[in-house]
Design a protein with these regions (language model features):
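Mid-to-C-terminal alpha-helical segments outside catalytic/metal-binding sites
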Residues: 1-54, 227-232, 244-289
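Hydrophobic/aromatic residues located in beta-strands of well-ordered beta-sheets
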Residues: 6, 55, 85-87, 144, ...
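Conserved, mostly hydrophobic/aromatic
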Residues: 10, 74, 114, 137, ...
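Active-site environment of divalent metal-dependent phosphoester hydrolases
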Residues: 12-17, 62-65, 93-97, 121, ...
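Short aromatic-enriched loop/helix-cap "lid" or pocket-rim segments at secondary-structure transitions
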Residues: 16-23, 68-70, 101, 156-158, ...
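Alpha-helical scaffolding within the catalytic cores
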Residues: 37-45, 69-75, 98-101, 163-165, ...
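Active-site gating/metal-coordination segments in enzymes
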Residues: 54, 64-160, 201
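Catalytic pocket-lining loop regions of alpha/beta-barrel enzymes
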Residues: 112-113, 126-233
Length: 289
């Protein structure tokens, strides 16, 4: 694969405000101090993503906090640009029929990975009741992306989102490709420790560039532990964009604090990392050619 490609592993599909409870929308606006438009429009994404070649997208299911995106919405979104979009299904394993939803999303809708939101839905990813999920992902080579780190939602239990829980999962299901979102912030040290020890566990840098000091510190941990190769590019659209994320990441190469700095070539390698190969996903353009 061309090493100049950019693959965004973390974008959302919210085709309307219907998936959100009023409380969820209010808390999202409170976190930004201003009302936020949560609706994703693919034309808006592409307008700020001219250099992005492939994009992974997903909805989200978390009954606890009032978020529920039907997987059909994601499948329909992918149809807008099947040569560049890869859709993941979402699951809330605290709710009935999640196993049937998993099989339907994968086998009938053609979605190619799984998105989990442990903190938003209120479950531990290593709970043995989720073993059928991890076995299915391992059997069918479905990568699993989990929200890790903090949230603006008051009802989201932080203890369910710690990166250490993925260590347990990866020891039991070592062949599953796992992505921990947001570098597990503010628990980046734990996240780095976990991606370092497990060959198929990765992290993305989505939604971090607007906290530049924190991201600089996080990537210094990545640098010192030698795990640049385990970190993937992602945005968290619609909360930010490809262009803003690229600018934010590249600006960190200009920062020097005492004797500490981040190598520009490592940041560029992160931006152009072949996430599809690492996650075992086919290029959608080749699949539809």
């Amino acid at each position: 694969m061309d090493n100049t490609m950019i693959i965004d592993v973390h974008t959302h599909v919210f085709t309307s405000n219907r998936p959100f409870s009023a409380t969820f929308l209010a808390e999202a606006s409170r976190a930004r101090s201003t009302p936020i438009d949560m609706i994703t429009r693919y034309a808006d994404y592409r307008a700020t993503a001219a250099n992005c070649d492939v994009t992974i997208c997903f909805g989200g299911k978390a009954h606890l906090v009032g978020l529920w995106v039907d997987d059909q919405d994601v499948a329909d979104y992918v149809k807008q640009d099947p040569a560049r979009l890869i859709g993941f299904l979402s699951l809330d394993p605290t709710q009935p029929n999640w196993q049937a939803e998993m099989e339907y999303g994968h086998q009938e809708l053609g979605l190619q990975g799984i998105k989990l939101m442990p903190m938003y839905a209120g479950f531990l990813p290593q709970d043995q009741q989720l073993d059928p999920l991890w076995r299915y992902a391992q059997q069918h080579n479905l990568p699993v992306l989990l929200h890790t780190g903090t949230t603006f939602v008051a009802q989201g239990p932080i203890e369910t989102t710690l990166p250490r829980h993925i260590d347990v999962v990866a020891r039991r299901f070592p062949e599953v490709r796992i992505i921990m979102a947001h570098l597990g912030h503010p628990f980046e040290g734990e996240c780095v420790a976990v991606i370092r020890k497990h060959p198929h566990v990765y992290a993305d840098v989505s939604a971090l560039h607007y906290r530049p000091w924190q991201l600089f510190h996080s990537l210094m941990l990545v640098h010192e532990y030698g795990v640049w190769n385990k970190v993937l590019f992602g945005t968290d659209f619609p909360f930010t964009t490809v262009d803003a994320s690229l600018t934010g990441l590249r600006s960190l190469a200009e920062v020097k604090i005492d004797r500490f700095s981040l190598p520009a070539e490592k940041i560029e390698a992160l931006i152009h990392r072949n996430a599809l190969e690492l996650l075992g996903l086919p290029h959608p353009g080749k699949a539809t050619a």
